[in-house]
From Swiss-Prot:
Name recorded for this polypeptide: Large ribosomal subunit protein bL27
HAMAP family: Ribosomal_bL27
Originating gene: rpmA
Any single biological process term in GO: translation
Species this protein is from: Psychrobacter arcticus (strain DSM 17307 / VKM B-2377 / 273-4)
Highest taxon above the source species: Bacteria
NCBIfam families, alphabetized: L27 (TIGR00062)
Length: 85
């Protein structure tokens, strides 16, 4: 049985809006409390000292300072910290 629909209906024509994910403030850059550091799906980056995590896993600064990225722990997880300037 053929799977061709009459009247030329299209199976395509869907597209989702961009989610603007990724790192917003890089290591060594100054940051103000409340600013977003990383927008992500899941915990690609984990919250370290001076960093909070929103319910959509967004990482944000809890205090003013300088952003630092580090890999540490048994599972080599990537952490984001905010060090006081």
């Amino acid at each position: 049985m053929a799977h061709k629909k009459a009247a030329g209906s299209s199976r395509n024509g869907r597209d989702s809006n961009p989610k603007m994910l990724g790192v917003k403030i890089f290591g060594g850059q100054a940051i103000v409390a409340g600013n977003i550091i990383v927008r992500q799906r899941g915990t690609e980056f984990h919250a370290g000292e001076g960093v909070g995590m929103g319910r959509d896993h967004t990482l944000f600064a809890l205090n003013d300072g300088v952003v630092k990225f580090a890999t540490k722990g048994k599972f080599n997880r990537r952490y984001v910290m905010v060090e006081s300037a």
